[in-house]
């Protein structure tokens, strides 16, 4: 369970909370968010903000008000739906024998592709060409993610299931290719990329 740092003694006046409506209320593209914190700090932030950005569009502001007033049950339902999708994709990759850490938030997972001997980009391009499944190479998200791919589960249950089937076929072919290479090439040539 998540515990807000602001709930600890003496921390409310030392905490800044920044959030938006994109994920919680499915308002992606509306470009509206908010910040909570000590009044004195927020006043200083407003001085900078008012000269660097325009206000959120009126329709976005009304949408946010409606979301806060009447959409909490919908938000809870979406949260449960995404938890089911997260579990499905996580278990799917585990079932394929891929190393993966179950995320606690976000709308994507990062399975490891290290054992297949391809870079994230090579893996992503081949997967798209061979199985028509789009993933993002992990190195697009910074150093240390070179041996991972990012897979979104912000889609239907059916698409997640079908994607896992297709990725399963793809990694099986990669494993067969690797075994075939191992028969004919010296061990140090196969694993030189590491």
Question: What is the predicted role of each segment?
Answer:
Residues 1-194:
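PLP-dependent class I/II
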């Amino acid at each position: 369970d998540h515990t807000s740092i602001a709930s600890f003694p003496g921390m409310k006046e030392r905490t800044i909370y920044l959030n938006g409506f994109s994920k919680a209320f499915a308002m992606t593209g509306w470009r509206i968010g908010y910040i909570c914190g000590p009044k004195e700090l927020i006043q200083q932030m407003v001085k900078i903000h008012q000269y660097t950005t325009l206000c959120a569009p009126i329709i976005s502001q009304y949408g946010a008000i409606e979301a806060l007033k009447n959409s909490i049950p919908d938000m809870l339902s979406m949260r449960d739906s995404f938890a089911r999708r997260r579990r499905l994709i996580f278990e799917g990759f585990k079932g394929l024998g891929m190393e993966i850490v179950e995320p606690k938030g976000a709308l994507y997972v990062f399975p490891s592709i290290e054992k297949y001997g391809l870079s994230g980009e090579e893996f992503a391009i081949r997967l798209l060409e061979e199985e028509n499944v789009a993933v993002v190479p992990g190195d697009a998200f910074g150093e240390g993610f070179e041996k991972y791919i990012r897979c979104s589960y912000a889609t239907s249950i059916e698409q997640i299931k079908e994607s896992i089937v297709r990725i399963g076929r793809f990694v099986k072919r990669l494993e067969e290719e690797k075994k075939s290479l191992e028969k004919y090439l010296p061990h140090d040539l196969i694993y030189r990329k590491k």
